[in-house]
Amino acid sequence: MQIGQRLGTPLSPSATRVMLLGAGELGKEVIIALQRLGVEVVAVDRYPDAPGHQVAHRAHVIDMTDAAALRAVVEAERPHLIVPEIEAIATDALAAIEAAGLAEVIPTARATQLTMNREGIRRLAAEELGLATSPYAFADSFDAFSAAVAKIGMPCVVKPVMSSSGKGQSVVRTEADVKPAWDYAMAGGRVNHGRVIVEGFIDFEYEITQLTVRAIDPATLETRTYFCEPVGHVQVAGDYVESWQPQPMSALALEKSREIAHKVTEALGGRGLFGVELFVRGDDVWFSEVSPRPHDTGLVTLASQRQSEFELHARAILGLPVDPTLGSPAASAVIYGGLDERGIAFEGVRDALAVPGADLRLFGKPESFAKRRMGVALATGASVDEARERAKRAAAAVRPVSAR
């Protein structure tokens, strides 16, 4: 496929075909962005009627950690590009698919392998690139875990090497927390990996996501790195509940953040948007994690930027020019399911959209859980503080209710 100049017509022999592996709320927005450019999109997920399935040209339900099933769906659909949107994927199969010339993996198969778990990316960042991180240790048994906690010291953070949205993540503050933290991590991993990272506690002031885009510069036709304004966010139990843009920070801290983001994304290579998570205290910055795809905290860019993180990702992977310019201060606030039920309804939508500058994204997930992210309220404002207040007010107005 000729990247960057030619796009075909969906559902025709000329179609530019993209397959998303993972069709949640972030994948759904990427699909919409791709379809606006006339791309034929195939969405794959582990459960039926996922948000992205509802808007894709075609949908498949498979276990994406099953290498044979993954290879079969790729051979059946013959996409030009494969875009992983989650971590729980048979990445060795992706490497084989790319090596066989069946499709190009975004950003690269190697990047997907490195970032599929926290061990690969932490070793790249700290040991190969020499970036500042929290002290850390890995463990694959309870005895090794106990020794790691003793080595790192308390308090410390425990995470499965493969999980997302805070699943399996906890803080060990006393000896009484050690066994429950191990059990919780084992239950919360995306796949039955049985391995955790123990991280020392960093006394940071705030966290940011530095959205970083590797895209083709139309002036040189070479890959160039672009930065969005920093996204601030609040996490509870490892799961984002609120984000805003721009996050105020010192010029030196911003420079360091972008230097770290540039180094790690350059090492991963390829094209696309990356979410680089960082801890900041004063002028000091520590690397935390990176995702080679749009980031949940970046949902705020649907309101804040001329091109959202999803549009930036779509353009970058297609070899098209990008523009990460900030349009307005904005914020997002999560709307939780509140109850465990399929096919819930939402009340208070009119009230939410009556908040000045507010908008909603209801994701359309077929099943709700009390703490499952079912939507997000967005708002712009003259300042970040005003946008945050509006987003939280709009989110609070939405009431998930039983449809029974």
From Swiss-Prot:
DNA-binding listed as a keyword: no
Keyword tags: ATP-binding, Ligase, Magnesium, Metal-binding, Nucleotide-binding, Purine biosynthesis
Residues engaged in binding ATP: R118, K159, S164, S165, G166, K167, G168, Q169, E199, G200, F201, I202, E207
Protein residues bound to Mg(2+): E277, E289
Residues of the ATP-grasp domain: 123-318
One annotated GO biological process: 'de novo' IMP biosynthetic process
Protein name, entry field: Formate-dependent phosphoribosylglycinamide formyltransferase
Organism, as annotated: Burkholderia ambifaria (strain ATCC BAA-244 / DSM 16087 / CCUG 44356 / LMG 19182 / AMMD) (Burkholderia cepacia (strain AMMD))
Designated gene of the protein: purT
